[in-house]
């Protein structure tokens, strides 16, 4: 079950969005009436995502979205606005907002936007994990190549023989070749 924070200065809108999301299996872990409260709730609850109005008192939704994104206080943010404004949309894109929903909102517009945002977020997170694994494998390969080169120089071995030597030594020591190379 996904954990959600709803931030809107209008209590009736928060209640309506809560009802829609809860009826679709989401858990509302917090509500906020301004951007600053949204940040505070996110720090406490660490939601999967936030649905936040743009125009709120104290701190706007866009300002709060920037803090939430930069401080990794939630998986992602979706913006809710009464305005079809290119400038707001451009700012939302710059802050990696995952969804832009124009009021009035109803279940038929909210739920597809939420599902698409969740799907895009999952794909983005998987790409980050894959990138991290690839970077780690590349780093491991660099260590192995460096160790292999040192063995080739010190023992006057071919590349293939140096690799076999590393493999044999790692098996004797009971550690991975990467650990040995480091």
Task: Name every feature range the model reports, one short phrase each.
Residues 34-37, 60-63:
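Acidic catalytic/metal-coordinating carboxylates
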